Regions:
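PLD/PLD-like phosphodiesterase catalytic module centered on the HKD motif
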Residues: 1-220
Length: 220
């Protein structure tokens, strides 16, 4: 099945739709690339996402994430170790990880199927945090589904946030989808005004990230 085969609505809203099962899961299950901008990420959100996306392991699927620069301390420590091992095998012994989802996340990272960059505002006009909420699914036919509006990055069926998303497809609304794609690619290649985009490890080693034990997210 491809993205075009899905029966997608133009909008999903929590009071009348199951956003996760009706939109996110079908799109994730039928894409080969998923691009996402989000205000924050955690070990739990990434491990849940990659564990549920079976085709990322079976095919040459990939995920590109652009996140804001706030992290829970333990999340940042774990993510730094996982991505550091990808580049310097042997620094981090992944065998000590007991959580199956995190083990799967480690494998996805080591196989270069997950890339993470950090967006940091660098202008007096935009001096807070990066909070853009946009996503793009692409399938084997090069069809695209784009969306905006949700802060849910895990696509966990236990998510209880009230939210709504607007959906655009390349076969019905190509101009809007092209704008979303261009916006993401400009961010990814650091060509967007008012923000600077860095590789996760570079941002961490350059002390550009904000972190606190109070920004806690359960990783179990």
């Amino acid at each position: 099945m491809t993205l075009r085969d899905l029966s997608l609505k133009q909008e999903y809203r929590s009071d009348r739709d199951d956003v996760v099962s009706e939109f996110f899961v079908p799109c994730l299950s039928n894409c080969i690339q998923y691009d996402r901008t989000i205000e924050y990420i955690s070990v739990k959100s990434l491990s849940t996402l990659t564990f549920g996306l079976e085709n990322i392991q079976d095919r040459q699927a990939k995920i590109r994430l652009i996140s804001g620069h706030r992290f829970n301390t333990s999340d940042l420590n774990m993510l730094t170790k996982l991505f550091d091992q990808q580049r310097s095998i042997g620094r981090f012994n992944g065998n000590i990880i007991q959580n199956d989802k995190i083990k799967h996340l480690q494998k996805i990272i080591n196989d270069f199927k997950l890339e993470v960059k950090i967006a940091i505002p660098n202008s007096e006009l935009v001096d807070g945090t990066f909070e853009e909420r946009m996503g793009i699914f692409r399938d084997t036919n090069d069809d695209v589904v784009a969306f905006s509006g949700t802060s849910n990055v895990t696509f966990d069926t236990q998510n209880r946030n009230f939210e709504s998303i607007d959906v655009f497809t390349s076969w019905d609304d190509k101009s809007r989808v092209d704008i979303k794609i261009k916006n993401f690619e400009n961010l990814w290649t650091n060509k967007t005004k008012y923000v600077q985009v860095y590789d996760l490890l570079f941002a961490e080693r350059s002390n550009l990230l904000k972190y606190s034990v109070e920004w806690a997210v359960d990783t179990n």
